Curated annotation (Swiss-Prot):
Domain of life: Eukaryota
Record-linked InterPro entries: GM130_C, GOLGA_cons_dom, Golgin_A
Keyword Coiled coil (UniProt): yes
Keywords, in A-Z order: Coiled coil
Signal peptide: none
Name of protein: Golgin subfamily A member 8M
Organism phylogeny: Eukaryota, Metazoa, Chordata, Craniata, Vertebrata
Bias (Polar residues) ranges: 38-50
Biased composition range(s): Gly residues: 508-520
GO cellular component: cis-Golgi network; Golgi cis cisterna; Golgi cisterna membrane
Species for this entry: Homo sapiens (Human)
Biased composition (Basic and acidic residues): 352-362
Length: 632
């Protein structure tokens, strides 16, 4: 298939060359006309304007024998060379397309990995929130247990006081028993004495008194046994409550240990995620650097109409993608607009930086006025590098502030957990002894830590400030792009309006035609248009990379802006000139008197046929000036 397309292209190119030479060649005898139609070559001199020198015309009239075959061979050789150049150019274009497809696939893979990492981070944040809810429930349960413990302590105090009262009553009863026994012994002694003294009728009264005393003693023994049993029950209940409290303390300590272990695992996972994100960012930066490397410029060839149409379709598609990316960036910037009161300090810093950037722009404009057109990209490269350094510094500051806030939050959470995990054993017997003398006071409820709330609120404020700063960084990058567009417009207008040979050189720099200024203008314009389209595809890829880097500037350490590298590569080659297809340049070119020249008309006609090419942004065409090769 590729060979057939190449043969078709060669046949079409030969037909066009024959038609061109049939139109522009002067009327000569039949032998000379046949030679020119078969060869389809270009005149040798650039000043003749498509006409052969008189010597050659004379040889064409008088020499038709062996010299005609030599002229045919001489005219066929450049056609064969151009066919070979066309073949090599098509192969190179296919290779470039394959590289672009592979880079797009790599970009999609990296974006897919980033999305997976974001999903994992979201899951971890959800788990963190669940843990915070569990911590709150544990705090509530701890408060409830503290209230239960307070009530238990009060009941224990009540039972202890009751047991003390019973012990006092026992002591009094024992004392009374001893007294009664002593009294009984005295009574028995007195009764024996009286029995010895008195007669038998007095013995009945004494026996009755003895029975009463025995009954009282039995009642007292029953009361003593009851008091001992109640005292033992109180002691058993106290032991059971103490064991229950010890078990609850052990459970709480185990729970706090588990929570601390889970927090440690979460910290480790967070560190691993940060490392993965750093690795992905490094891989992205490497890919961007690889994509941003400028391709070595090669001499353009004369493209066919099919290639031109294909390139125009690609340009329209790339322009549509650029418009979609710009719209997406605008939507993201609109969604990320938040409160302005919290970023006053950051706005002041950014204002200072903007003032510096404006001063740099003014100095660049002042320096660019006396200099030539080809020395201006150096100053613009310096300004773009300074802007990139400022954006990188801002992003590094944002990353450092985010890490500091996260470390502070982790420290506060660990401090809270350590305070909650402290055992309450130091408030045991002393607390009971002190409260036994004083009136019982209600147990205060455990208040929530206000420092944790302040830390969470400050962390959320910091996240919002980070989002606002990322928006401001995007705005600065968009301003830089607009400034670059304006500079391109100025350069193009300067090139179009400049009198002399530069406009001609810019128009003539696209092809390998060796025709003069009058006879070969159409072929040269076609070559310049083909070179411009090839250069636009390279620039469009770089511009797309720059927009993607601006879109991902909030998540990555540094934006990959390939525009300065492309400019640096352009400065190294030296003899570059820019051609634009924007609407403003078109309007200025219509009023320009240079459009009367045939070299500038095909470019304007191409832009009128495809107006969508200049709708998005400035599209500079870096074209080589092949005048030295023509002169050779």
């Amino acid at each position: 298939m590729a060979e057939e397309t190449q043969h078709n292209k060669l046949a079409a190119a030969k037909k066009k060359l024959k038609e061109y030479w049939q139109k522009n060649s002067p009327r000569v005898p039949a032998g000379a006309n046949r030679n020119r139609k078969t060869n389809g070559s270009i005149p040798q001199t650039a000043t003749s304007g498509g006409c052969q020198p008189p010597g050659d015309s004379a040889t064409g009239f008088h020499r038709e024998g062996p010299t005609s075959s030599a002229t045919l061979k001489d005219l066929e050789s450049p056609c064969q060379e151009r066919a070979v150049v066309l073949d090599s150019r098509s192969v190179e274009i296919s290779q470039l397309k394959n590289t672009i497809k592979s880079l797009k696939q790599q970009k999609k893979q990296v974006e897919h990995q980033l999305e997976e990492e974001k999903k994992a981070n979201n899951k971890k944040q959800k788990a963190k929130r669940v843990l915070e809810v569990q911590l709150q429930t544990l705090n509530i349960q701890k408060e409830e247990l503290n209230t239960d413990l307070y009530h238990m302590k009060r009941s224990l105090r009540y039972f202890e006081e009751k047991s003390k009262d019973l012990a006092v009553r026992l002591q009094h009863s024992l004392q009374r028993k001893g007294e009664l026994e002593s009294v009984l012994s005295d009574v028995m002694a007195t009764q024996k004495k009286k029995a010895n003294q008195l007669s038998s009728p007095s013995k009945a009264g004494t026996e009755w008194k003895l029975e009463q005393s025995m009954r009282e003693e039995a009642l007292l023994k029953v009361q003593l046994t009851q008091l001992k049993e109640s005292f033992q029950q109180v002691q058993l209940e106290r032991d059971e409550y103490s064991e229950h409290l010890k078990g609850e303390r052990a459970r709480w300590q185990q729970r706090m240990r588990k929570m601390s272990q889970e927090i440690c695992t979460l910290k480790k996972e967070k560190q691993q995620d940060m490392r993965r994100v750093e690795k992905l960012e490094r891989s992205l930066s490497k890919l961007k650097n690889q994509m941003a490397e400028p391709l070595p410029p090669e001499p353009p060839a004369v493209p066919s109409e099919v290639e031109l149409q294909h390139l125009r379709k690609e340009l329209e598609r790339v322009a549509g993608e650029l418009q979609a990316q710009v719209k997406n960036n605008q939507r993201i910037s609109l969604l990320n607009q938040r409160q302005e009161e919290r970023i006053r300090e950051q706005e002041e810093r950014l204002r200072k930086q903007e003032e510096r950037i404006q001063e740099q722009h003014k100095s660049l404009q002042q320096l660019a006025k006396p200099q030539s057109v080809f020395e201006e990209p150096n100053n613009e490269n310096k300004s773009t590098l300074q802007l990139e350094q400022q954006v990188k510094e801002l992003q590094e500051k944002l990353g450092e502030e985010h890490l500091e806030a996260a470390s502070q939050q982790n420290q506060q959470l660990t401090a809270q957990l350590s305070l909650m995990a402290l055992p309450g054993e130091g408030h045991g017997g002393e607390h009971l002894d002190s409260e036994g003398e004083e009136a019982p006071q209600p147990m205060p409820s455990v208040p929530e830590d206000p420092e944790s709330r302040e830390a969470m609120s400050s962390f959320m404020d910091h996240l919002e400030e980070k989002a606002d700063l990322s928006e401001l960084v995007k705005k600065q990058e968009l301003r830089f792009i607009q400034y670059w567009q304006e500079r391109c417009h100025q350069k193009i207008h300067h090139l179009l309006s400049e009198p002399g040979g530069r406009a001609k050189d810019a128009a003539l720099g696209g092809g390998h035609h060796q025709a003069g200024a009058q006879g070969g203008d159409e072929g040269e314009a076609a070559g310049a248009a083909a070179d411009g389209i090839a250069a636009y595809s390279n620039y469009n890829n770089g511009h797309r990379k720059f927009l993607a880097a601006a879109h991902n500037s909030a998540d990555e350490p540094g934006p990959g802006a390939p525009a300065p590298q492309e400019l640096g590569a352009a400065d190294k080659h030296g003899d570059l000139c820019e051609v634009s297809l924007t609407s403003s340049a078109q309007g200025e070119a219509r009023e320009d008197p240079l459009l009367d020249k045939p070299t500038a008309q095909p470019i304007v006609q191409d832009h009128q046929e495809h107006p969508g090419l200049g709708s998005n942004c400035c599209v500079p065409f870096f074209c080589w000036a092949w005048l030295p090769r023509r002169r050779r």
